[in-house]
A protein has these predicted regions:
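Short beta-strand immediately N-terminal to the catalytic nucleophile in serine-hydrolase-like folds
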Residues: 101-103, 126
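Active-site glycine-rich loops that stabilize anionic/oxyanionic intermediates
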Residues: 26, 33-38, 189
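Gly/Ala-rich beta-loop-alpha elbow adjacent to hydrolase catalytic centers
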Residues: 103-111
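The alpha/beta-hydrolase serine catalytic core
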Residues: 4, 118-201, 205-212, 216-220, ...
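Conserved alpha/beta-hydrolase
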Residues: 48-70
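The serine-hydrolase catalytic nucleophile loop
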Residues: 36-48, 63, 197
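N-terminal cap/lid segment of alpha/beta-hydrolase-fold proteins
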Residues: 1-24
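Catalytic nucleophile-loop/oxyanion-hole region of alpha/beta-hydrolase
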Residues: 66-95
Length: 238
């Protein structure tokens, strides 16, 4: 993907590496990346290019154990991600008038946990995890373990994503039951991680617009996929 040179500023918020994309504006998008990604992932770069052209500023940051924080050893937990997203939101609200969200994969899930009661203008989700418990159950089946075995082992490593029992308990205790923000969702037709029926159920329940890219995957990384994502965004950024 050819990347344009953008106006960006590297800062730290409570020690967390952050990039502010674009010039000061009265509207800002808070962006949360997915697993094995970072604050400068291709999809966030595309978002920044498209959003800046529409007059937005974008804030992206590295989640625990990602990007500049790969040295961290503590298992990434949802409650810590919620805490950090709230820090970013507080910063954004001090520097702009309207805050919107972008979330990719698990980043979208953490935003769902964090912002159900916040003042949010608009939301754009790419390949969002809308039901983390189902994904964990799918991984448990893949690893051929029961919940009882999982509880005893606490951590189960595999070739997809490690399973951690306290994470699972948190997910079960924090279901997504409220989401009233105007939300646009893009997923790939062949996304096997966030299955169609799960995402469709979420979209129907909370009145979200759902778009599929034909032959698309969970990870939007090819030029064709990113071009589709860019066009989709540009039609929905106002």
């Amino acid at each position: 993907m050819e990347k344009r040179i953008l106006n960006l500023n590297k800062i730290r918020i409570d020690g967390i590496p952050v990039i502010i994309w674009g010039k000061p504006s009265d509207k800002m998008i808070l962006a949360a990346h997915g697993s094995h990604s970072s604050k400068i992932d291709d999809c966030i770069w595309v978002l920044a290019e498209a959003a800046i052209n529409k007059g937005y500023q974008v804030l992206s940051f590295d989640l625990p154990q990602h990007g500049e924080r790969v040295y961290e050893t503590d298992f990434i937990m949802p409650d810590e991600c919620v805490r950090e997203l709230n820090l970013m939101y507080t910063y954004a609200m001090k520097h702009t008038k309207k805050v919107s969200l972008f979330g990719c994969s698990m980043g979208a899930y953490f935003e769902l946990l964090t912002f159900s009661n916040a003042v949010i203008d608009r939301v754009w989700f790419l390949s969002p995890v809308t039901n983390m418990e189902r994904i964990i159950h799918n991984l448990m089946n893949y690893c051929h373990i029961t919940e009882e075995v999982f509880q005893k082992k606490v951590r189960v490593d595999n070739d997809i994503e490690p399973l951690y029992y306290p994470y699972y308990v948190y997910v079960k205790n924090h279901p997504i039951i409220k989401w009233t923000h105007k939300t646009f969702i893009l997923r790939g037709e062949n996304d096997t991680m966030c299955e169609y029926d799960t995402v469709k159920s979420f979209a129907d329940k909370f009145g979200c617009e759902l778009t599929e890219q034909k032959n698309g995957e969970h990870w939007f990384h090819t030029n064709t996929q990113l071009d589709f994502f860019r066009a989709w965004l540009e039609e929905r950024l106002i």
